[in-house]
Amino acid sequence: MPIAKDYPELSKLIEDMYQTMYHSNGVGLAAPQVGLAIRLFVVDTEPFCENDDLSDAERDYLKSFKKAFINAKILKEEGEPWPFSEGCLSIPGISEDVLRKPTIVIEYQDEHFVTHTETFSGLVARVIQHEYDHIEGVLFTDHLSSFKKQLLKNKLNNISNGKVKVGYKMRFFETNKKRTR
């Protein structure tokens, strides 16, 4: 659901989401991950700046990239898809290579509801795509092959049944295994 300018305590929500993300050692967090069906996610790529394979310029950029995205819409994804191991606070203990295009153009509003259209590339684009997927109802595992999903089935079932230990609070929703008419 789009967020209106008068959304109650939006600044506090954004700050709380950053704190939750930091406490959980994440680089991004979307509102659906904290139980809110709104188009909001936050990103802070500083943890990636420790990667020795990056140039000094890339490290500096990652270290300083922190943004909230409100009512975001990816307008374009470009380039040859490249694999990178992704994990997710919603699916703890699982990391898999996900193919994503390296460059995106995204339109979003900042915390002051100023609209921006920007182009991002590399790891920043990947994190944005990952978090954007959450507000679209998509998880990184949805990008995996059927074979890979089958290999992960038991782990995913354990997570969805609450059989997982993490250093942060998780909510588990009961699922009906049978259809009702």
Over which residues does each language-model region extend?
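Positively charged
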Residues: 1-181
